Amino acid sequence: MGASIALELSKNGRKVVVIDKGGAPGAGSTSASSAIIRFTYSNFNTILMAWEAAQYWYNWSDFVGVEDPDGMAKFVKTGYLVFLTEGYDGVRQRELWDQFGIPYEVLSPEEVRKRWPAFETGKFYPPKSIEDPAFADDPYDQLSALFDPLSGFMDDPMLAAHNLAHAAKSHGAEFFFHKEVSGITKSGDRVTGVTLASGESISAPIVINAAGPHAAKINRLAGVYDEMKVHHQPLRQEVFSPPAPVGFRLEDNAPIVADLDLGQYFRPHMGDLLNVGTTEPACDPLHFIEDADDWNDQVTVEFFERVMLRLARRLPDFGIPLKLLGIGALYDVTDDWIPLYDKSSLNGFFMACGTSGNQFKNAPLVGKFMRILIEAQEQGIDHDVTPLEFVGEATGKAINLGAFSRLRSEAVTAGNVMG
């Protein structure tokens, strides 16, 4: 997010300084992202945002505008399959996709198996703990699915962040790594800059919080956290990269899969691997973190076994590996799993946070959102009173930025990483 914002603002003539505690662009949560580009969200604004952002990923080099000597991230088109199960029938999704011109198919269980024979299309709902005696029960019905052919993933999310940062630098942006913000300076009701743990101070009339899992801490330093109606905090997650079974590799045209029936998502990856995570089913405990600098970034046997055994139910030929292959990472999760792209009660202090593990795909638009929020405040427009809109280039339809306000009522969403 920070690199996207830096590019948009520097490209529009602003002097931009990026402070990052990490060692490189995208070295934090971005590097652990599954980097999925999909349109399966819960409401008008979030689906429209994802569809508009996808157009930039499809033409990534054109969007970035500057060739990165380290290489350019690439979009891998796989399509996206969502099994239709309890609590998700896809009807609202299809209505909105029809409005935006997003193509899709509804596939019967037989059609799913014909296209991808690796699947078991049986229904296991609800998702269960592996300690539950019913976990091994046979499926009791069959699942149809919703498939869109235009989704996919970026092959290297950290490289994508590097591409954005490199382009921002070409427009004059400066990046400082291994630097930690320890304070937000103010004069009255206006931000004046930041102080660093090293003792340095940086003066700035505009400060944007895009600190990922550290963002709640920064909002507290600014004194704006308590006035927010929607809050956010770090959530620990694990994502695994086991070998893919024969029949479900990139060469087999395997899709990205949202399996809410078992509480997981997975996709094919390069090197005959899978990328597997969870959709936070009710049977799984959530591990919120108090301090984003003090947590276990190693995968755990408990999490690994749970995810692998569920995956084997959907892909019967999947061989559960003996070695723990994966990473621990942090989401910055809001109360409703919808992000915060907003101003604050402190003039000049803005936030692009609460990305909830599902916003990598929208990074190309976030810089544009923040630019118009800043410009509106400079023009005396109160976004809290008169919510701004962003008109998408692809559809000509308006995204209501009030949907991402810190003062919104909690949105009705999937209540998990699906958003």
Task: Describe each region flagged by the PLM.
Residues 12, 106, 345-419:
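C-terminal lid/capping helical subdomain adjacent to the catalytic/cofactor pocket in oxidative enzymes
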Residues 7-11, 15, 35-37, 59, ...:
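Active-site substrate-recognition segment that forms the wall
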